[in-house]
Every structure is written in structure tokens, then in C-alpha cells.
């Protein structure tokens, strides 16, 4: 399909798919850990009561949802999309939520009830599975030494 004729939210989904693939997420095949418009299990579908998150991402080593992503067309305010994603994530107990229009991205940690922090800054882009797993124990992750962070400021 020509991207010039796609609905705007579909364009956002193409960008999301590319980003997730580049980060090592599996969109299809035997190792698939990205699910479109539904979670993986019937129990999670039931918890959502017919609602359909745009994406649900899982760790390759777990059946528990790790991330919910809400996709919106360019120019739509992400606050409402993030809130929608938070509701879905809390229903299926996913700790991380992302909302994006393909240009901007907002993230939220449902357990800490605040944005996740990476190296002292709010997360504003999709992350690899290995990094997402580190957010299971804390809303704040450091991948560089505190000295480097301090020197950067």
C-alpha cells in the first residue's frame, strides 16, 4: 500500500513497527513478542473487557505483558492517548505505557505512577526489551555512571 494513501494513524503504526523492529522486538514468527490490537492471552482479553490497545509487548521469557503502546495520528495530543494506554496497562498489569504520534513519544510507569526515568531524563522514545525489563524493579534506570551524568549537566 502506498504510504500517501494510508490513514494517518496507519502511518504512525508503520513508524512504530520500524522502531520496534530496530530495537529487536519480534513482530511475527515463532519468537513474536509484539501483539497488535489485543493481548496474547484470553485472560488478558477478558480483563480489558473488549477494549483493544494498539500494541502489547511481552518479554520473550514471560507471559506477562511488559508494555502497552497507543498510536495516534500526527498532531493529536498525546495526553489523552497516554491516559487511555494507562487504563489498558493497569487492567492487564503491564508496567510501562508509551503513547506516540510517530514524531513525539510519552512514557509512563504504571507501578510508580510517574514517567520512567533513564539516566536522569524522562524516557521519550521506545526502548529495547532488556531495558524495559530493568523497569520491573524501579521507575528509574541508569545506564551511565553518575559522574558522566553530573559532568553532562
Task: Identify the role of each PLM range.
Residues 1-66, 72-153:
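ATP-dependent helicase/translocase motor core
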